[in-house]
A protein has these predicted regions:
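Glycine-rich phosphate/pyrophosphate-handling loop used in enzymes and phosphotransfer proteins
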Residues: 1-156, 161-225
């Protein structure tokens, strides 16, 4: 499903998408990946995203699901960047593990050294929209900006709640010279109506309007990204 800038914060983003709503078995799958020392579960989320969002065929290597490369993929993402972790004690970054299968399926390089979290603040879970915005303000910075210049970037996160985190990441990437940033996550939380009333950073970048959230994901509802 494509996310709407009328319902989520998509400041400085060309757009955003997630195949599922964050509830039921989807929520349990994300929590397993995040809180049960299960990096393999995070990679399976990425395999599912490659299949649902890009049409990658899933094959099994033993008990491990793997995405096949997407033939004829020519969208033009030049870099895949995971949202940096807020909890370094976990030992692995869930979005980075999710991004690995996507990188393999699309043939797009995955980089973990270009977008950095420079301050560790409160977890975003349970915060209001205003608290989330304050919490991520100045939380990210870029490294090696010459490697970001004029690049079309695919940003990966596990869950998009209000869009505050992905918007903050996109903001610093564009400031570093990136051409465009598109965000994808495994799931999205039902949006808060107030999200669209918050002003974006005033650096001249705008966000195009997208269609409203689709009612429910279908396995054959692939996106032409």
């Amino acid at each position: 499903m494509r996310l709407s800038s009328a319902q989520h914060l998509l400041h400085d983003l060309d757009g955003a998408a997630a195949p599922y709503r964050y509830s039921g078995s989807v929520r349990r799958a994300v929590l397993t990946a995040k809180y049960h020392n299960a990096p393999w579960a995070a990679e399976e989320l990425g395999v599912e995203m490659a299949h649902l969002l890009f049409g990658s065929e899933v094959v099994m290597r033993g008990a491990e699901p793997l995405p096949r490369p997407v033939e004829g993929y020519a969208r033009g993402y030049q870099l895949i960047l995971p949202v940096p972790p807020s909890n370094r004690r976990r030992g692995y970054n869930v979005p980075e593990r999710m991004a690995r299968p996507l990188s393999a399926a699309l043939g797009v390089p995955l980089r973990t050294d270009l977008l950095l979290r420079v301050c560790s603040r409160r977890k975003q879970e349970g915060l209001t929209l205003e608290e989330r915005l304050e919490n991520v303000a100045n939380a990210f910075q870029t490294a090696h900006p010459e490697q970001l210049e004029n690049k079309r970037i695919l940003l990966i996160d596990d869950v998009i709640t209000t869009g505050a985190t992905i918007s903050a990441c996109a903001h610093v990437l564009l400031q570093a010279g990136a051409e465009s940033v598109y965000a994808m996550a495994f799931a999205t939380v039902e949006p808060a109506p107030a999200a669209s009333n918050t002003s974006p950073p005033s650096d001249g970048h705008t966000t195009p309007e997208l269609s409203a959230l689709d009612p429910a994901p279908e396995e054959d509802d692939l996106f032409d990204f």
